[in-house]
Swiss-Prot record:
Binding sites annotated in the UniProt record for [4Fe-4S] cluster: 36
Protein name: Light-independent protochlorophyllide reductase subunit B
Keyword Nuclease applies: no
Biological source species: Synechococcus sp. (strain RCC307)
UniProt catalytic activity: chlorophyllide a + oxidized 2[4Fe-4S]-[ferredoxin] + 2 ADP + 2 phosphate = protochlorophyllide a + reduced 2[4Fe-4S]-[ferredoxin] + 2 ATP + 2 H2O
InterPro entries: ChlB/BchB/BchZ, LI-POR_suB-like_C, Nase/OxRdtase_comp1, P-CP_red_C, Protochl_reductB, Protochlorophyllide_Rdtase
Subunit structure: Protochlorophyllide reductase is composed of three subunits; ChlL, ChlN and ChlB. Forms a heterotetramer of two ChlB and two ChlN subunits.
Protein function: Component of the dark-operative protochlorophyllide reductase (DPOR) that uses Mg-ATP and reduced ferredoxin to reduce ring D of protochlorophyllide (Pchlide) to form chlorophyllide a (Chlide). This reaction is light-independent. The NB-protein (ChlN-ChlB) is the catalytic component of the complex.
Positions that bind substrate: 425-426
Lineage: Bacteria, Bacillati, Cyanobacteriota, Cyanophyceae, Synechococcales
Length: 527
Protein backbone atom coordinates (compact mmCIF):
# COMPACT_ATOMS: atom_id res chain seq x y z
CA UNK A 1 0.00 0.00 0.00
CA UNK A 2 1.24 3.49 -0.85
CA UNK A 3 0.33 6.87 0.60
CA UNK A 4 0.25 9.47 -2.16
CA UNK A 5 -1.22 12.83 -3.04
CA UNK A 6 -2.53 11.65 -6.40
CA UNK A 7 -3.46 8.38 -8.07
CA UNK A 8 -4.27 7.80 -11.73
CA UNK A 9 -6.72 4.99 -10.97
CA UNK A 10 -8.94 4.16 -8.03
CA UNK A 11 -9.38 0.67 -6.54
CA UNK A 12 -11.09 -1.95 -8.74
CA UNK A 13 -14.50 -1.57 -7.09
CA UNK A 14 -14.64 1.96 -8.58
CA UNK A 15 -14.27 0.34 -11.99
CA UNK A 16 -17.20 -1.94 -11.16
CA UNK A 17 -19.21 1.13 -10.16
CA UNK A 18 -18.44 2.70 -13.55
CA UNK A 19 -19.98 -0.29 -15.33
CA UNK A 20 -23.05 -0.39 -13.07
CA UNK A 21 -23.62 3.36 -13.37
CA UNK A 22 -23.15 3.25 -17.15
CA UNK A 23 -25.90 0.68 -17.64
CA UNK A 24 -29.66 0.51 -17.19
CA UNK A 25 -31.35 -2.18 -15.08
CA UNK A 26 -28.16 -3.14 -13.21
CA UNK A 27 -27.61 -2.70 -9.48
CA UNK A 28 -24.40 -3.13 -7.48
CA UNK A 29 -24.34 -4.22 -3.83
CA UNK A 30 -21.00 -3.21 -2.39
CA UNK A 31 -19.80 -4.57 0.94
CA UNK A 32 -17.97 -1.51 2.28
CA UNK A 33 -17.63 0.76 5.31
CA UNK A 34 -19.25 4.17 5.32
CA UNK A 35 -16.00 5.88 4.31
CA UNK A 36 -15.93 4.13 0.93
CA UNK A 37 -19.07 5.90 -0.28
CA UNK A 38 -16.90 8.80 -1.53
CA UNK A 39 -16.97 7.33 -5.05
CA UNK A 40 -20.52 8.64 -5.58
CA UNK A 41 -19.05 12.12 -6.04
CA UNK A 42 -17.08 11.00 -9.07
CA UNK A 43 -20.34 10.55 -10.96
CA UNK A 44 -22.46 13.40 -9.59
CA UNK A 45 -19.74 16.07 -9.59
CA UNK A 46 -17.33 15.18 -12.40
CA UNK A 47 -19.75 13.49 -14.81
CA UNK A 48 -22.49 16.03 -13.93
CA UNK A 49 -25.09 13.30 -13.61
CA UNK A 50 -28.48 14.07 -12.11
CA UNK A 51 -28.61 10.80 -10.18
CA UNK A 52 -26.46 8.73 -7.87
CA UNK A 53 -24.87 5.56 -9.18
CA UNK A 54 -27.03 2.43 -8.64
CA UNK A 55 -25.04 1.18 -5.67
CA UNK A 56 -26.18 -0.10 -2.28
CA UNK A 57 -23.52 -0.05 0.44
CA UNK A 58 -23.60 -2.34 3.43
CA UNK A 59 -21.90 0.52 5.36
CA UNK A 60 -20.68 -1.58 8.26
CA UNK A 61 -19.16 0.22 11.22
CA UNK A 62 -16.49 -0.67 13.76
CA UNK A 63 -19.02 -2.04 16.24
CA UNK A 64 -20.36 -4.43 13.57
CA UNK A 65 -17.01 -6.20 13.31
CA UNK A 66 -17.64 -7.96 16.62
CA UNK A 67 -20.84 -9.52 15.29
CA UNK A 68 -22.01 -11.37 12.20
CA UNK A 69 -21.17 -9.09 9.25
CA UNK A 70 -22.21 -11.84 6.84
CA UNK A 71 -25.81 -11.43 8.00
CA UNK A 72 -25.52 -7.69 7.35
CA UNK A 73 -24.39 -8.48 3.80
CA UNK A 74 -27.31 -10.82 3.13
CA UNK A 75 -29.80 -8.32 4.53
CA UNK A 76 -28.42 -5.57 2.28
CA UNK A 77 -28.55 -7.84 -0.78
CA UNK A 78 -32.13 -8.89 -0.08
CA UNK A 79 -33.27 -5.30 0.53
CA UNK A 80 -31.62 -4.06 -2.69
CA UNK A 81 -33.15 -6.87 -4.76
CA UNK A 82 -36.63 -6.21 -3.36
CA UNK A 83 -36.45 -2.43 -3.64
CA UNK A 84 -34.77 -1.94 -7.04
CA UNK A 85 -35.71 -5.24 -8.76
CA UNK A 86 -32.79 -5.03 -11.21
CA UNK A 87 -32.43 -7.17 -14.32
CA UNK A 88 -28.97 -8.16 -13.07
CA UNK A 89 -27.32 -7.82 -9.66
CA UNK A 90 -23.60 -7.24 -9.15
CA UNK A 91 -22.18 -8.15 -5.74
CA UNK A 92 -18.68 -7.30 -4.56
CA UNK A 93 -16.56 -5.77 -1.83
CA UNK A 94 -14.37 -2.71 -1.43
CA UNK A 95 -10.67 -2.77 -0.59
CA UNK A 96 -11.47 -2.35 3.12
CA UNK A 97 -14.12 -5.08 3.23
CA UNK A 98 -11.80 -7.48 1.42
CA UNK A 99 -9.85 -7.79 4.67
CA UNK A 100 -12.91 -9.21 6.47
CA UNK A 101 -13.31 -12.02 3.89
CA UNK A 102 -17.10 -12.26 4.10
CA UNK A 103 -17.26 -13.31 0.41
CA UNK A 104 -20.50 -11.44 -0.39
CA UNK A 105 -20.67 -12.86 -3.92
CA UNK A 106 -20.87 -16.42 -2.66
CA UNK A 107 -23.49 -15.39 -0.10
CA UNK A 108 -25.63 -13.78 -2.81
CA UNK A 109 -25.46 -16.79 -5.11
CA UNK A 110 -26.82 -18.97 -2.32
CA UNK A 111 -29.89 -16.77 -1.73
CA UNK A 112 -31.93 -17.97 -4.76
CA UNK A 113 -32.64 -14.46 -6.00
CA UNK A 114 -34.98 -14.08 -9.00
CA UNK A 115 -32.41 -12.24 -11.16
CA UNK A 116 -28.93 -13.17 -12.46
CA UNK A 117 -26.27 -12.56 -9.80
CA UNK A 118 -22.72 -11.72 -10.86
CA UNK A 119 -20.15 -12.31 -8.15
CA UNK A 120 -17.18 -9.96 -8.49
CA UNK A 121 -13.81 -10.95 -7.07
CA UNK A 122 -11.68 -7.85 -7.54
CA UNK A 123 -8.29 -8.06 -5.77
CA UNK A 124 -7.94 -4.53 -4.47
CA UNK A 125 -4.30 -4.81 -3.46
CA UNK A 126 -2.97 -5.97 -6.82
CA UNK A 127 -5.37 -4.51 -9.43
CA UNK A 128 -6.85 -1.09 -10.12
CA UNK A 129 -9.85 0.73 -11.56
CA UNK A 130 -9.59 -0.01 -15.30
CA UNK A 131 -8.96 -3.69 -14.62
CA UNK A 132 -11.97 -3.70 -12.31
CA UNK A 133 -14.16 -2.16 -15.01
CA UNK A 134 -12.93 -4.65 -17.62
CA UNK A 135 -13.41 -7.63 -15.30
CA UNK A 136 -16.92 -6.51 -14.31
CA UNK A 137 -17.98 -6.03 -17.93
CA UNK A 138 -16.48 -9.40 -18.86
CA UNK A 139 -18.18 -11.28 -16.01
CA UNK A 140 -21.51 -9.62 -16.76
CA UNK A 141 -21.37 -10.56 -20.46
CA UNK A 142 -20.20 -14.07 -19.67
CA UNK A 143 -23.00 -14.67 -17.14
CA UNK A 144 -25.77 -13.32 -19.36
CA UNK A 145 -24.61 -15.08 -22.55
CA UNK A 146 -23.85 -18.45 -20.97
CA UNK A 147 -27.24 -19.95 -22.02
CA UNK A 148 -26.54 -18.93 -25.64
CA UNK A 149 -23.10 -20.55 -25.97
CA UNK A 150 -22.95 -22.51 -29.25
CA UNK A 151 -22.06 -26.22 -29.11
CA UNK A 152 -18.41 -27.15 -29.50
CA UNK A 153 -17.24 -27.68 -33.06
CA UNK A 154 -19.86 -25.42 -34.64
CA UNK A 155 -18.44 -23.39 -37.53
CA UNK A 156 -17.94 -19.67 -36.99
CA UNK A 157 -20.62 -17.38 -38.44
CA UNK A 158 -19.70 -15.54 -41.64
CA UNK A 159 -19.38 -11.74 -41.16
CA UNK A 160 -20.84 -11.35 -44.67
CA UNK A 161 -24.05 -13.25 -43.88
CA UNK A 162 -26.01 -9.97 -43.90
CA UNK A 163 -25.89 -10.03 -47.71
CA UNK A 164 -27.93 -13.24 -47.87
CA UNK A 165 -30.40 -11.97 -45.26
CA UNK A 166 -31.17 -8.79 -47.23
CA UNK A 167 -30.26 -6.24 -44.56
CA UNK A 168 -27.45 -3.88 -43.59
CA UNK A 169 -24.52 -5.25 -41.56
CA UNK A 170 -24.61 -4.77 -37.79
CA UNK A 171 -21.78 -4.11 -35.35
CA UNK A 172 -21.50 -3.59 -31.59
CA UNK A 173 -19.61 -0.71 -29.97
CA UNK A 174 -17.98 -2.05 -26.81
CA UNK A 175 -16.05 -0.19 -24.14
CA UNK A 176 -17.55 3.30 -23.64
CA UNK A 177 -18.39 4.00 -20.00
CA UNK A 178 -18.89 6.79 -17.51
CA UNK A 179 -15.71 8.54 -16.35
CA UNK A 180 -14.11 7.66 -19.67
CA UNK A 181 -12.73 10.49 -21.79
CA UNK A 182 -15.51 11.95 -24.02
CA UNK A 183 -17.16 8.52 -24.40
CA UNK A 184 -20.66 9.95 -24.86
CA UNK A 185 -19.58 12.12 -27.79
CA UNK A 186 -17.35 9.43 -29.28
CA UNK A 187 -20.30 7.04 -29.49
CA UNK A 188 -22.39 9.67 -31.26
CA UNK A 189 -19.60 10.41 -33.76
CA UNK A 190 -18.86 6.74 -34.49
CA UNK A 191 -22.58 6.07 -35.01
CA UNK A 192 -22.63 8.76 -37.70
CA UNK A 193 -19.46 7.36 -39.27
CA UNK A 194 -20.90 3.83 -39.38
CA UNK A 195 -24.15 5.05 -40.89
CA UNK A 196 -22.21 6.77 -43.68
CA UNK A 197 -20.56 3.42 -44.42
CA UNK A 198 -23.94 1.67 -44.54
CA UNK A 199 -23.51 -0.13 -41.21
CA UNK A 200 -26.06 -0.29 -38.39
CA UNK A 201 -25.03 0.16 -34.75
CA UNK A 202 -26.54 -2.85 -32.99
CA UNK A 203 -25.55 -2.58 -29.30
CA UNK A 204 -23.52 0.05 -27.45
CA UNK A 205 -22.23 -1.27 -24.13
CA UNK A 206 -21.79 -0.72 -21.29
CA UNK A 207 -22.81 2.94 -21.77
CA UNK A 208 -26.61 3.10 -21.91
CA UNK A 209 -27.08 -0.67 -22.30
CA UNK A 210 -29.33 -2.99 -20.32
CA UNK A 211 -28.76 -6.69 -19.55
CA UNK A 212 -31.25 -7.48 -22.31
CA UNK A 213 -29.08 -5.51 -24.75
CA UNK A 214 -26.05 -7.57 -23.75
CA UNK A 215 -27.98 -10.73 -24.62
CA UNK A 216 -28.37 -9.37 -28.18
CA UNK A 217 -24.62 -8.92 -28.74
CA UNK A 218 -24.12 -12.20 -30.70
CA UNK A 219 -26.70 -11.09 -33.29
CA UNK A 220 -24.19 -8.63 -34.79
CA UNK A 221 -21.57 -9.45 -37.40
CA UNK A 222 -18.62 -7.96 -35.48
CA UNK A 223 -17.54 -6.11 -32.37
CA UNK A 224 -15.70 -2.79 -32.36
CA UNK A 225 -13.35 -2.47 -29.38
CA UNK A 226 -13.50 1.29 -28.87
CA UNK A 227 -11.72 1.30 -25.50
CA UNK A 228 -9.40 -1.71 -24.96
CA UNK A 229 -8.92 -0.82 -21.28
CA UNK A 230 -12.56 -1.80 -20.68
CA UNK A 231 -13.59 -4.07 -23.55
CA UNK A 232 -10.51 -6.03 -24.67
CA UNK A 233 -11.08 -9.11 -22.50
CA UNK A 234 -14.80 -9.21 -23.40
CA UNK A 235 -14.09 -8.92 -27.13
CA UNK A 236 -11.55 -11.75 -26.98
CA UNK A 237 -14.04 -13.97 -25.12
CA UNK A 238 -16.79 -13.23 -27.66
CA UNK A 239 -14.36 -14.07 -30.46
CA UNK A 240 -13.45 -17.40 -28.86
CA UNK A 241 -16.97 -18.48 -27.88
CA UNK A 242 -19.15 -17.00 -30.64
CA UNK A 243 -16.64 -16.54 -33.46
CA UNK A 244 -17.32 -12.80 -33.58
CA UNK A 245 -14.41 -10.90 -35.19
CA UNK A 246 -13.10 -7.79 -33.45
CA UNK A 247 -12.21 -4.50 -35.11
CA UNK A 248 -9.34 -3.27 -32.96
CA UNK A 249 -8.42 -0.05 -34.77
CA UNK A 250 -9.47 2.91 -32.62
CA UNK A 251 -10.59 5.78 -34.92
CA UNK A 252 -8.75 8.65 -33.21
CA UNK A 253 -7.06 10.87 -35.79
CA UNK A 254 -7.40 11.11 -39.58
CA UNK A 255 -5.12 8.18 -40.41
CA UNK A 256 -6.68 5.87 -37.83
CA UNK A 257 -10.21 6.79 -38.92
CA UNK A 258 -9.38 5.96 -42.54
CA UNK A 259 -7.80 2.67 -41.43
CA UNK A 260 -10.87 1.94 -39.28
CA UNK A 261 -13.19 2.41 -42.27
CA UNK A 262 -11.06 0.18 -44.51
CA UNK A 263 -10.88 -2.56 -41.88
CA UNK A 264 -14.66 -2.58 -41.48
CA UNK A 265 -15.29 -2.60 -45.23
CA UNK A 266 -12.91 -5.51 -45.81
CA UNK A 267 -14.31 -7.51 -42.88
CA UNK A 268 -17.97 -7.04 -43.81
CA UNK A 269 -17.53 -7.26 -47.58
CA UNK A 270 -18.61 -3.68 -48.27
CA UNK A 271 -17.60 -1.78 -51.38
CA UNK A 272 -14.69 0.59 -50.66
CA UNK A 273 -15.85 4.20 -50.68
CA UNK A 274 -14.00 7.49 -50.86
CA UNK A 275 -12.84 8.48 -47.41
CA UNK A 276 -14.60 11.36 -45.69
CA UNK A 277 -11.45 13.05 -44.37
CA UNK A 278 -12.56 16.17 -46.25
CA UNK A 279 -15.07 16.65 -43.43
CA UNK A 280 -12.17 17.49 -41.14
CA UNK A 281 -10.22 20.73 -41.34
CA UNK A 282 -7.13 19.16 -39.83
CA UNK A 283 -5.61 17.78 -43.10
CA UNK A 284 -6.17 21.13 -44.84
CA UNK A 285 -4.39 23.05 -42.10
CA UNK A 286 -1.56 20.52 -42.00
CA UNK A 287 -0.84 21.36 -45.65
CA UNK A 288 -1.04 25.12 -45.13
CA UNK A 289 1.83 27.56 -44.70
CA UNK A 290 0.62 28.46 -41.20
CA UNK A 291 1.22 24.90 -40.02
CA UNK A 292 4.99 25.25 -40.48
CA UNK A 293 4.99 27.00 -37.11
CA UNK A 294 4.02 23.66 -35.55
CA UNK A 295 6.60 21.49 -37.32
CA UNK A 296 9.14 19.96 -35.00
CA UNK A 297 7.43 20.99 -31.78
CA UNK A 298 8.60 18.79 -28.91
CA UNK A 299 5.68 16.99 -27.26
CA UNK A 300 5.51 14.79 -24.15
CA UNK A 301 2.59 12.31 -23.93
CA UNK A 302 1.33 10.44 -20.86
CA UNK A 303 -2.21 9.05 -20.67
CA UNK A 304 -4.19 5.82 -20.70
CA UNK A 305 -2.93 3.42 -23.37
CA UNK A 306 -5.67 4.06 -25.94
CA UNK A 307 -5.25 7.82 -26.00
CA UNK A 308 -1.47 7.81 -25.51
CA UNK A 309 -0.87 5.57 -28.54
CA UNK A 310 -3.34 7.55 -30.65
CA UNK A 311 -1.79 10.86 -29.60
CA UNK A 312 1.71 9.66 -30.48
CA UNK A 313 0.55 8.63 -33.94
CA UNK A 314 -1.28 11.91 -34.59
CA UNK A 315 1.58 14.03 -33.27
CA UNK A 316 4.31 12.30 -35.25
CA UNK A 317 2.50 11.45 -38.51
CA UNK A 318 -0.24 14.04 -38.90
CA UNK A 319 1.03 17.22 -37.23
CA UNK A 320 4.78 16.88 -37.66
CA UNK A 321 5.55 17.13 -33.95
CA UNK A 322 8.59 15.49 -32.40
CA UNK A 323 7.49 13.08 -29.67
CA UNK A 324 10.14 13.28 -26.93
CA UNK A 325 8.32 11.24 -24.30
CA UNK A 326 5.58 8.59 -24.31
CA UNK A 327 4.11 6.69 -21.41
CA UNK A 328 1.01 5.39 -19.68
CA UNK A 329 -0.31 4.34 -16.30
CA UNK A 330 -2.19 1.41 -17.92
CA UNK A 331 -0.05 -1.57 -16.95
CA UNK A 332 -2.44 -4.05 -18.61
CA UNK A 333 -1.78 -2.35 -21.97
CA UNK A 334 1.93 -1.72 -21.38
CA UNK A 335 3.07 -3.95 -24.25
CA UNK A 336 1.18 -1.90 -26.84
CA UNK A 337 2.53 1.36 -25.40
CA UNK A 338 6.10 0.05 -25.46
CA UNK A 339 5.69 -1.02 -29.09
CA UNK A 340 4.44 2.45 -30.04
CA UNK A 341 7.36 4.05 -28.20
CA UNK A 342 9.90 1.80 -29.93
CA UNK A 343 8.61 2.94 -33.33
CA UNK A 344 9.51 6.48 -32.28
CA UNK A 345 12.90 5.50 -30.89
CA UNK A 346 11.80 6.04 -27.29
CA UNK A 347 11.63 4.00 -24.11
CA UNK A 348 8.06 4.01 -22.78
CA UNK A 349 7.42 5.24 -19.26
CA UNK A 350 4.99 2.84 -17.55
CA UNK A 351 4.28 4.25 -14.11
CA UNK A 352 1.50 5.33 -11.76
CA UNK A 353 3.78 7.68 -9.81
CA UNK A 354 2.99 11.25 -10.84
CA UNK A 355 6.31 12.53 -9.46
CA UNK A 356 8.21 10.16 -11.73
CA UNK A 357 6.15 11.38 -14.67
CA UNK A 358 6.82 15.01 -13.77
CA UNK A 359 10.57 14.38 -13.55
CA UNK A 360 10.55 12.68 -16.97
CA UNK A 361 8.55 15.60 -18.34
CA UNK A 362 11.07 18.11 -17.04
CA UNK A 363 14.01 16.11 -18.40
CA UNK A 364 12.43 15.90 -21.87
CA UNK A 365 11.94 19.71 -21.92
CA UNK A 366 8.90 19.61 -24.24
CA UNK A 367 7.05 22.56 -25.73
CA UNK A 368 3.67 20.86 -25.27
CA UNK A 369 2.39 18.25 -22.81
CA UNK A 370 -0.52 15.93 -23.64
CA UNK A 371 -1.73 14.09 -20.57
CA UNK A 372 -4.25 13.71 -17.77
CA UNK A 373 -5.47 16.19 -15.19
CA UNK A 374 -2.28 15.57 -13.20
CA UNK A 375 -0.01 16.40 -16.14
CA UNK A 376 -1.89 19.69 -16.46
CA UNK A 377 -0.84 20.56 -12.89
CA UNK A 378 2.74 19.41 -13.47
CA UNK A 379 3.01 21.31 -16.75
CA UNK A 380 1.72 24.46 -15.10
CA UNK A 381 4.40 24.16 -12.42
CA UNK A 382 7.01 23.87 -15.18
CA UNK A 383 5.50 26.65 -17.30
CA UNK A 384 4.71 24.35 -20.25
CA UNK A 385 1.46 24.46 -22.32
CA UNK A 386 -0.72 21.39 -21.80
CA UNK A 387 -3.84 19.74 -23.23
CA UNK A 388 -5.80 17.00 -21.42
CA UNK A 389 -6.34 13.95 -23.65
CA UNK A 390 -7.31 11.19 -21.21
CA UNK A 391 -8.88 10.19 -17.92
CA UNK A 392 -8.48 10.82 -15.03
CA UNK A 393 -10.06 14.17 -15.64
CA UNK A 394 -11.67 17.17 -14.00
CA UNK A 395 -15.16 18.56 -14.48
CA UNK A 396 -13.80 21.07 -17.02
CA UNK A 397 -12.84 18.11 -19.23
CA UNK A 398 -16.46 16.92 -19.37
CA UNK A 399 -17.89 19.70 -21.57
CA UNK A 400 -21.61 20.18 -22.05
CA UNK A 401 -20.95 20.83 -25.75
CA UNK A 402 -20.28 18.19 -28.39
CA UNK A 403 -16.54 17.46 -28.30
CA UNK A 404 -15.62 13.94 -29.51
CA UNK A 405 -12.12 12.54 -29.95
CA UNK A 406 -13.01 9.94 -32.58
CA UNK A 407 -13.92 10.27 -36.24
CA UNK A 408 -13.62 13.26 -38.55
CA UNK A 409 -15.06 15.76 -36.08
CA UNK A 410 -12.87 14.30 -33.36
CA UNK A 411 -9.82 15.22 -35.46
CA UNK A 412 -11.04 18.83 -35.50
CA UNK A 413 -11.50 18.85 -31.73
CA UNK A 414 -8.07 17.32 -31.15
CA UNK A 415 -6.43 19.83 -33.46
CA UNK A 416 -8.01 22.76 -31.62
CA UNK A 417 -7.18 21.33 -28.20
CA UNK A 418 -3.53 20.75 -29.05
CA UNK A 419 -2.71 23.75 -31.21
CA UNK A 420 -4.41 26.49 -29.19
CA UNK A 421 -2.02 26.17 -26.21
CA UNK A 422 0.92 26.57 -28.62
CA UNK A 423 -0.66 29.55 -30.36
CA UNK A 424 -1.40 31.13 -27.00
CA UNK A 425 2.26 30.61 -26.16
CA UNK A 426 3.20 32.64 -29.23
CA UNK A 427 0.80 35.37 -28.15
CA UNK A 428 2.32 35.22 -24.67
CA UNK A 429 5.74 35.90 -26.16
CA UNK A 430 4.49 38.87 -28.18
CA UNK A 431 2.84 40.35 -25.10
CA UNK A 432 6.08 39.79 -23.22
CA UNK A 433 8.05 41.64 -25.88
CA UNK A 434 5.87 44.72 -25.53
CA UNK A 435 4.96 44.46 -21.85
CA UNK A 436 7.04 47.54 -21.00
CA UNK A 437 4.87 49.76 -23.21
CA UNK A 438 2.48 51.91 -21.21
CA UNK A 439 -0.69 50.14 -22.42
CA UNK A 440 0.47 46.74 -21.08
CA UNK A 441 0.56 45.66 -17.44
CA UNK A 442 1.67 42.46 -15.74
CA UNK A 443 -1.94 41.50 -15.10
CA UNK A 444 -2.39 40.74 -18.77
CA UNK A 445 -0.05 37.78 -18.55
CA UNK A 446 -2.83 35.50 -17.48
CA UNK A 447 -3.47 32.48 -19.62
CA UNK A 448 -1.16 29.82 -18.22
CA UNK A 449 0.00 31.03 -14.85
CA UNK A 450 3.56 31.91 -14.02
CA UNK A 451 5.77 29.63 -11.98
CA UNK A 452 5.23 30.49 -8.27
CA UNK A 453 8.23 31.71 -6.30
CA UNK A 454 9.93 29.73 -3.58
CA UNK A 455 10.94 26.09 -3.19
CA UNK A 456 7.55 24.82 -4.38
CA UNK A 457 8.31 25.91 -7.93
CA UNK A 458 10.64 23.19 -9.13
CA UNK A 459 12.91 24.24 -11.98
CA UNK A 460 12.90 21.81 -14.94
CA UNK A 461 16.68 21.49 -14.82
CA UNK A 462 16.61 20.74 -11.09
CA UNK A 463 13.89 18.10 -11.49
CA UNK A 464 15.80 16.41 -14.27
CA UNK A 465 18.97 16.47 -12.22
CA UNK A 466 17.25 15.00 -9.18
CA UNK A 467 15.83 12.23 -11.35
CA UNK A 468 19.33 11.42 -12.58
CA UNK A 469 20.94 11.67 -9.14
CA UNK A 470 22.98 14.80 -9.96
CA UNK A 471 24.07 17.03 -7.11
CA UNK A 472 22.56 20.51 -7.30
CA UNK A 473 26.02 22.12 -7.00
CA UNK A 474 27.00 20.58 -10.33
CA UNK A 475 24.07 22.18 -12.20
CA UNK A 476 24.49 24.85 -14.81
CA UNK A 477 23.62 28.37 -13.71
CA UNK A 478 22.15 31.08 -15.89
CA UNK A 479 23.59 34.48 -15.04
CA UNK A 480 21.18 37.44 -15.07
CA UNK A 481 22.71 38.68 -18.33
CA UNK A 482 22.21 35.26 -19.92
CA UNK A 483 18.60 35.01 -18.70
CA UNK A 484 17.84 38.49 -19.99
CA UNK A 485 19.22 37.66 -23.42
CA UNK A 486 17.40 34.31 -23.49
CA UNK A 487 14.08 36.02 -22.69
CA UNK A 488 14.47 38.17 -25.82
CA UNK A 489 14.52 35.09 -28.04
CA UNK A 490 11.08 34.21 -29.52
CA UNK A 491 9.08 31.67 -27.55
CA UNK A 492 8.88 29.16 -30.35
CA UNK A 493 12.68 28.70 -30.59
CA UNK A 494 13.68 29.62 -27.05
CA UNK A 495 13.64 26.01 -25.83
CA UNK A 496 15.96 24.87 -28.61
CA UNK A 497 18.38 27.77 -28.02
CA UNK A 498 18.38 27.01 -24.28
CA UNK A 499 19.19 23.33 -24.84
CA UNK A 500 21.93 24.09 -27.37
CA UNK A 501 23.53 26.67 -25.08
CA UNK A 502 23.53 24.32 -22.10
CA UNK A 503 24.99 21.53 -24.22
CA UNK A 504 27.71 23.92 -25.43
CA UNK A 505 28.48 24.98 -21.85
CA UNK A 506 28.64 21.41 -20.54
CA UNK A 507 31.05 20.34 -23.25
CA UNK A 508 33.40 23.18 -22.30
CA UNK A 509 33.01 22.92 -18.53
CA UNK A 510 31.27 26.28 -18.23
CA UNK A 511 29.02 26.47 -15.17
CA UNK A 512 27.85 30.10 -15.29
CA UNK A 513 26.04 30.89 -18.56
CA UNK A 514 26.26 34.58 -19.42
CA UNK A 515 25.08 36.44 -22.51
CA UNK A 516 28.55 35.98 -24.01
CA UNK A 517 28.29 32.20 -23.66
CA UNK A 518 24.90 32.31 -25.37
CA UNK A 519 26.40 34.30 -28.29
CA UNK A 520 29.29 31.84 -28.58
CA UNK A 521 26.92 28.86 -28.58
CA UNK A 522 24.78 30.48 -31.24
CA UNK A 523 27.83 31.04 -33.43
CA UNK A 524 28.99 27.47 -32.83
CA UNK A 525 25.71 25.83 -33.87
CA UNK A 526 25.17 28.11 -36.87
CA UNK A 527 28.38 26.94 -38.58
Amino acid sequence: MELTLWTYEGPPHVGAMRIAASMQGVHYVLHAPQGDTYADLLFTMIERRDQRPPVTYTTFQARDLGGDTAELVKRSIRDAADRFQPQALLVGESCTAELIQDQPGALAQGMNLPMPVVSLELPAYSKKENWGAAETFYQLIRTLLKPQLPPAGLSKPDPKRWQEQGRRPRVNLLGPSLLGFRCRDDVREVRVLLDELGIDTHVVAPLGASPEDLRRIPQAEANICLYPEVADSSCRWLERQFGMPTVSTVPIGIGATEMFCRELQELLGLEPTSQGSGQSRMPWYSRSVDSTYLTGKRVFIFADATHAIAAARIASRELGFEVVGLGSYSREQARAVRAAAEELGLAALISDNYLEVEAAMAEAAPELVLGTQMERHSAKRLGIPCAVISSPLHVQDVPARYAPQMGWEGANVIFDSWVHPLMMGLEEHLIGMFRHDFEFVDGHMSHKGEKPPGPEAADPITLAAEANGVDEAELLRWAPSGQAELSRIPFFVRGKVKRNTESYAQERGIINITDEVLYEAKAHFSR
